[in-house]
Every structure is written in C-alpha cells, then in structure tokens.
Regions:
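Gly/Ser-rich helix-loop-strand patches that form or flank binding pockets
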Residues: 76, 80-93, 98
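Gly/Ser/Thr-rich active-site loops/lids in small-molecule metabolic enzymes
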Residues: 170-203
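Catalytic core of DAGKc-family lipid kinases
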Residues: 95-175
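Short glycine/serine/threonine-rich phosphate/pyrophosphate-binding segments
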Residues: 12-13, 72-77, 185-191
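ATP/NTP phosphate-donor binding region
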Residues: 1-64, 105-119, 130-141
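N-terminal glycine-rich "phosphate-gripper" loop used for MgATP/nucleotide binding
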Residues: 67-71, 79-80
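Short, well-ordered beta-strand core segments
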Residues: 65, 88, 177-178
Length: 203
C-alpha cells in the first residue's frame, strides 16, 4: 500500500504515519516516496518498516494508493495511476474533501479494505494530448476532473473548433473551452444552477 501526502507539512506527515502504523498492525507493506524519506525518518511517529521507493516504482508496485490531503492530492494521484488501473483511497485532510472517502476519525474502516470487504467506484477520465500542426505530439496526460483550453493571460477571444471523432460539432469565439468528466462537472453544474451528474456515469 502506497501512502501519498505532502510530508513537508507537519500535520499531514503525522496523519500519514498514523495511517501507516495502523496498516502495519495488519502486516501490510507500506510504500512511501523516496523523496520524502528524510522527513519521515525525522518524524517521532516513525516506527520503521516503511519502504522508500522512486515515485514511478512506488506507483508500479502498489496495489492501493492512499492519498491524504484535499481533492488536489487525489487528482494528482489519479493522473499518475490512470495507466496503471489501480485503486485510490482518499482520506480528507482538507476542508471539503469532495472526492475523499474517509476522514481521519474513520481509520477503523481500513480493516475492511484489508479483509477485502470493499467496492471500487470506476470514474471516467480524460486522455489529453496536444498535437502541433505538423502532427508532432507535444504533451500527454490524464485528468480525472477537467481539461481547460484557454488563451492564457491575454484578454482576447480566440477562435475555437470543436470536433468529436473527426466530425465538426461547432465553431465559436470565446475565451476558452472546458472539457469535463462527470466527476469534474459538479462545481460547474452547481455554479450554473444545473443538476449534478452521477460521477460514475461513463463519458
């Protein structure tokens, strides 16, 4: 089980090690980024038996990633785990924690996961690629929430053409375009007074 958080923040590091110590009580193998090794070793709550790995190897070897923080931490993990098709469990350390499943007061629920008593919610993601005019791929990534096309800091409308499977859908002038998954559409729908999509709906 990989544990991911910002170990530079004292409270988050303490929370992560509390989770690690709980899981070690069930003989789980705990993985943490090698980048955070010094901060973990210096923490008084460190009890040993944590494996420190390069970040890519950590995601490759983990059967489950536990992300402690706010929605941003979960979104970052989702981007890295997309091509690996492995589950993420969010534990909320932020304010709202829309995507987190647990609070720190609910750590006893982790025993159910160890016992195999859980279900996995599968969410649609966006496969993003930026291609230049000559067909060269400039950027590739994944997103659990949304992809935004904008003109940056320039206050000027841009000409947009939207295609779906090589078929032109529409042309318009605007300051940008937001392509959102059901998971990422919630805030946009609420701000527009619209209905909220079930995040498990397929794109």
């Amino acid at each position: 089980i990989a544990i991911v958080t910002n170990f530079n923040i004292f409270d988050k590091a303490n929370a992560a090690l509390k989770v690690a110590n709980y899981l070690l009580g069930y003989d789980c193998k705990i993985l943490v980024s090698q980048y955070s090794k010094d901060r973990v070793l210096a923490n008084k709550n460190y009890n040993g038996n944590i494996y420190f790995l390069p970040i890519e190897r950590l995601y490759d070897e983990a059967d489950l990633v536990i992300a402690l923080g706010g929605d941003g931490t979960i979104l970052d993990c989702a981007k890295k785990m997309a091509k690996r098709d492995k589950p993420i469990l969010g534990i909320n350390l932020g304010h709202l924690g829309y995507m987190a499943e647990l609070e720190m007061s609910e750590l006893d629920s982790l025993s159910k996961i160890i016992e195999g008593n859980f279900t996995i919610d599968r969410r649609s993601m966006i496969d993003i690629e930026i291609v230049s005019k000559d067909g060269t791929s400039k950027f590739k990534s994944y997103a659990l929430n949304d992809a935004v096309i904008t003109n940056g800091s320039v206050s000027k409308l841009i000409n947009l053409e939207l295609y779906a499977e090589d078929n032109l859908v529409t042309k318009y002038r605007a300051d940008g375009l937001i392509i959102s998954t059901p998971t990422g559409s919630t805030a946009y729908a609420m701000s527009a007074g619209g209905s909220i999509s079930d995040p498990k709906v397929q794109c």
